[in-house]
Amino acid sequence: MKILAVVLISVIVLNTANGENYYPQKYTNDYYGCQQQTDAFCDKVCKLHLAESGFCDQSWGLAKACKCVNVSYDNSFYFNALESQCPLLNKSAA
């Protein structure tokens, strides 16, 4: 029974520690389109947003957009991701 409780708590902690899948947004609040790009392009974009990886997703009919795997909601926004990487950019730290 104790093992089951430890496993359950571990799963809950891991799920809250990891992010989810989000479409990253540029500094203009637009999504990164990938109509003529590859999964490698989206992977690079997503890693800049501190995601585990990324791919080109076509969930919106004809439009294709980069989707990031395991990224926090905050880091899906361009300036939030920059502030996470460089604390000197954080407005509240000044």
UniProtKB/Swiss-Prot annotation:
Q: Which Gene3D superfamilies match?
A: Knottin, scorpion toxin-like
Q: One GO cellular component from the entry?
A: extracellular region
Question: What are the record keywords, sorted?
Answer: Disulfide bond, G-protein coupled receptor impairing toxin, Ion channel impairing toxin, Neurotoxin, Potassium channel impairing toxin, Secreted, Signal, Toxin, Voltage-gated potassium channel impairing toxin, Voltage-gated sodium channel impairing toxin
Q: Which InterPro entries match?
A: LCN-type_CS_alpha_beta_dom (IPR044062), Scorpion_toxin-like_sf (IPR036574), Scorpion_toxinL/defensin (IPR002061)
Q: Name one Pfam family in it.
A: Toxin_3
LCN-type CS-alpha/beta domain sequence ranges: 20-87
Q: In which tissues is it expressed?
A: Expressed by the venom gland.
Keyword Disulfide bond recorded: yes
Q: Which cysteines in this chain are paired by disulphide bridges?
A: C34-C56, C42-C66, C46-C68
Q: From which residue to which does the signal peptide run?
A: 1-19
List the subcellular locations: Secreted
Q: Does the keyword Signal apply?
A: yes
**Record GO terms (molecular function):** potassium channel regulator activity; sodium channel inhibitor activity; toxin activity
Chief subcellular location equals: secreted
The entry assigns this protein to a family as follows: Belongs to the long (3 C-C) scorpion toxin superfamily.
Q: What is known of its domains?
A: Has the structural arrangement of an alpha-helix connected to antiparallel beta-sheets by disulfide bonds (CS-alpha/beta).
Main function: The homodimer inhibits HMG-CoA reductase (HMGCR) (32% of inhibition produced by 0.6 uM), a glycoprotein involved in the control of cholesterol biosynthesis. The inhibitory effects of bumarsin are seen at much lower concentrations (0.6 uM) than that for statins such as atorvastatin (5 mM) and simvastatin (10 uM). In addition to inhibition of HMG-CoA reductase, this protein lowers cholesterol levels by inducing steroid hormone synthesis via StAR, and by increasing reverse cholesterol transport mediated by the induction of ABCA1 and APOA1.
* Assembly and binders: Homodimer; disulfide-linked or monomer (edited version) or heterodimer of an alpha chain (AC P0CI44 or AC P0CI45) and this beta chain (non-edited version).
What is the protein name stated in its UniProt record?
A: Lipolysis-activating peptide 1-beta chain
Tell me which species this is from. Answer: Lychas mucronatus (Chinese swimming scorpion)
